[in-house]
Regions:
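Short, basic/aromatic recognition patches
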Residues: 1-22
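Short beta-strand scaffold segments in enzyme catalytic cores
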Residues: 27-35
Length: 81
């Protein structure tokens, strides 16, 4: 794994720690475009009572919102699971 990928996985692990501290299953995710994190997410199912609030889905929704597009061309997703 290259140093950039390692740093992005560390960021995803930080998100997983946030999930754990909120009583969630500790899964975290970051989405990157052009070397920059554009979205983060962690499991929020218990706190939101939303069965779709998995870390990846939360991050994907935030990325799409930020880019104002549903196609996330050129993006990479890093997830702890």
């Amino acid at each position: 794994m290259n140093p950039f990928d390692e740093s992005m996985m560390r960021e995803a692990l930080r998100e997983a720690e946030l999930a754990l501290s909120a009583g969630e299953l500790p899964v975290g995710c970051v989405i990157v475009k052009g070397g920059e994190i554009i979205a983060r997410g962690h499991n929020e199912r218990e706190t939101t009572l939303d069965p779709t609030a998995h870390a990846e889905i939360v991050a994907l929704r935030r990325a799409a919102n930020r880019l104002n597009a549903w196609r996330l061309n050129g993006c990479a997703l890093y997830v702890t699971l």
